[in-house]
């Protein structure tokens, strides 16, 4: 009984001592009336931050050790127009800071008309259709450089790298299923080159995670023709369908290859350098933080990007960050549909170094 009491007292003391000794980071994407996080809900989050007298800082300030006790990072991925339309006015209203990680392929110089805001899957699919067609993917559903510059000049928003294209790659040739053109999204369009039913679905990851499995695009129609002639409406068992499909894939290895180490490095270096160059050209800032697309991390790519000047890597791994952070993996808590109560609970857990670490371990 006494030992249990002593342990309990020690735990309570540790929780008290380490309260406000962590730097939680929260992750958003879109904030608009049709997203899971509406402007009204986001404002409630800011009110909670204000209620607990927390200091919002940018990722650059965090790295430069400009970190008051009780600090928090607000981060946004991709660079959607609603970040300018809804988020920026609220940050100004509450005098709070944020960091936005940009995909530069989709950003136009100047906006001519204000768009009707769409969900991010629709936005990115439309952009990729144009990219496949013309090689250009600027779309008014993303912020313009004029808007981004206005935000940057306010000193409230830091802008850093999130890759140029934010696309995927195949990592294996083991078939997982078949495409449904009505459900295909931007990464699938990028990989297949067109939206079609009955293309083989292979495992994929973010482009920055390593060496890609390369598939010649003509194979997809060859496979589709084989499937529709020999399997569709003839075999009903799912496992048998996959077995027969895999046998055909394995018989056609000439359509597949794996990137060399040099090809992988070249691809990463070119995409990141373009991302960095465009941001720095438009803002005059220093880009040295990289946010993993989809949170897909790679130790090998960390090494490559460090050679290109990256000093900090931003993940989607839950938990919190100590004031002396692990810059190979800044943890973030993703907010897709957190109500105010859930936001408050996560905030209070993650600003405590001990509780935040436990949260990260069990998540």
Question: Each PLM stretch: what is its role?
Answer:
Residues 1-75, 81-82, 86, 171-363:
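C-terminal active-site subregion of NodB/CE4 polysaccharide deacetylases
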Residues 31-34, 106-107, 135-138:
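Short histidine/acidic/glycine/proline-rich micro-motifs that form metal-
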Residues 32, 104-106, 163-167, 296:
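Active-site-proximal loop/turn and secondary-structure-junction residues that shape catalytic pockets
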Residues 50, 90-95, 144-160, 306, ...:
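Acidic (Asp/Glu)-rich catalytic clusters
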Residues 80-81, 165:
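Short active-site segment of divalent metal-dependent hydrolases/proteases
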Residues 95-122:
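A short, conserved beta-to-alpha structural element at the edge of catalytic cores
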Residues 99-101, 160, 291, 313-314:
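Structural detector of well-ordered beta-strand residues that form the stable sheet scaffold
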Residues 111-115, 121-211:
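A substrate-binding/cap region within the structured catalytic cores of diverse enzymes
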């Amino acid at each position: 009984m006494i030992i249990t009491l002593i342990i309990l007292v020690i735990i309570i003391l540790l929780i008290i001592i380490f309260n406000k000794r962590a730097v939680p980071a929260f992750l958003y994407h879109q904030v608009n009336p049709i997203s899971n996080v509406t402007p009204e809900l986001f404002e409630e989050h800011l009110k909670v931050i204000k209620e607990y007298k927390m200091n919002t800082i940018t990722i650059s300030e965090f790295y430069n050790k400009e970190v008051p006790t009780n600090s928090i990072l607000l981060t946004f991925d991709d660079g959607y127009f609603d970040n300018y339309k809804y988020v920026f006015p609220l940050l100004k209203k509450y005098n709070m800071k944020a960091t936005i990680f940009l995909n530069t392929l989709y950003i136009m110089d100047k906006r001519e008309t204000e768009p009707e805001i769409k969900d991010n899957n629709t936005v990115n699919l439309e952009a990729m259709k144009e990219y496949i067609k013309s090689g250009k993917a600027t779309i008014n559903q993303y912020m313009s450089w004029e808007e981004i510059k206005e935000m940057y000049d306010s000193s409230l928003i830091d802008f850093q790298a999130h890759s140029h294209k934010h696309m995927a790659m195949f990592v294996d040739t083991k078939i997982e299923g078949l495409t449904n053109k009505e459900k295909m999204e931007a990464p699938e369009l990028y990989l297949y080159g067109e939206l079609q039913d009955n293309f083989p679905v292979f495992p994929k990851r973010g482009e920055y995670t390593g060496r890609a499995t390369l598939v010649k695009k003509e194979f997809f129609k060859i496979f589709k023709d084989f499937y529709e002639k020999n399997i569709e409406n003839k075999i009903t068992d799912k496992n048998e369908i996959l077995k027969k499909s895999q046998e055909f894939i394995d018989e056609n290895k000439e359509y597949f290859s794996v990137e060399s180490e040099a090809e992988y490095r070249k691809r990463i270096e070119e995409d990141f350098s373009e991302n960095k160059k465009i941001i720095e050209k438009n803002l005059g800032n220093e880009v040295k933080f990289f946010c993993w697309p989809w949170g897909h991390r790679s130790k090998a790519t960390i090494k490559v990007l460090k050679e290109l000047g990256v000093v900090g890597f931003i993940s989607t791994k839950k938990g919190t960050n100590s004031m002396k952070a692990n810059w190979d993996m800044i943890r973030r808590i993703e907010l897709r549909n957190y109500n105010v109560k859930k936001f408050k609970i996560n905030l209070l857990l993650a600003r405590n170094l001990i509780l935040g670490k436990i949260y990260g371990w069990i998540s």
